[in-house]
């Protein structure tokens, strides 16, 4: 009573009942609709407004995941300009993107941090979560992202102390941990057929 029977080996559905509200099913496999946007134009210093700057980063706020297309051949510089051989390598391109995102989120957090930290000092730990969440809801952060970020600061630097004593280093750790949760990054290697071992 109230229990489901185990799935028989002969059941082609393997226990799947596919009746989606959106999307569809093919052979009892759920097809989930996604929207992809092409956000081009990230350059070093975008978090400071260089290039498309904050417009580029604001476009990312609409994304649930990122697919970074990197030049596996190493024939372009970090800004995507053709340079022949000796350009940036895919690892540099990935690190560049994560550093820009971390700096962008750090900037959002740092703006008003002292005021928020005083609020935390007066109201307690819950106020810290609320302050960070208030700062980052515009880019899609939720309570879980904030909790993971705060835990990361405490793990990376157990002597970090109270939030009102945090330095730029702790805020960067917080931003990086939140970015990792908020924007999972998948890397697509473009021009991999032309890549040499030196480009990696």
Report the location of each language-model feature:
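Conserved C-terminal guanine-recognition region of P-loop GTPase G domains, centered on the G4
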Residues: 23-31, 52-200
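Switch I (G2) and immediately adjacent beta-strands of P-loop GTPase domains
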Residues: 1-47, 58-66, 71-72
């Amino acid at each position: 009573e109230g229990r489901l029977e185990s799935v028989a080996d002969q059941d082609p559905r393997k226990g799947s009942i596919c009746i989606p509200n959106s999307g569809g099913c093919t052979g009892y496999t759920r097809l989930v609709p996604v929207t992809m946007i092409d956000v081009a134009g990230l350059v070093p210093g975008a978090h400071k407004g260089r290039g498309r700057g904050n417009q580029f980063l604001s476009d990312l706020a609409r994304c649930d995941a990122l697919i970074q297309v990197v030049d596996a051949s190493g024939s372009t510089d970090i800004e995507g300009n053709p340079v022949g051989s000796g350009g940036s390598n895919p690892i540099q391109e990935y690190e560049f993107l994560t550093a820009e995102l971390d700096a962008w989120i750090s900037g959002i957090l740092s703006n008003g941090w002292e005021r928020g930290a005083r609020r935390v000092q007066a109201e307690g730990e819950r106020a810290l979560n609320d302050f960070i969440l208030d700062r980052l809801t515009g880019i899609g952060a939720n309570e879980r992202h904030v909790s993971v970020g705060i835990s990361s600061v405490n793990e990376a630097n157990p002597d970090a102390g109270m939030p009102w004593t945090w330095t730029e280093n702790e805020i960067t750790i917080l931003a990086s941990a939140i970015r990792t949760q908020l924007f999972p990054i998948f890397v697509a290697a473009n021009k991999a057929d032309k890549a040499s071992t030196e480009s990696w």
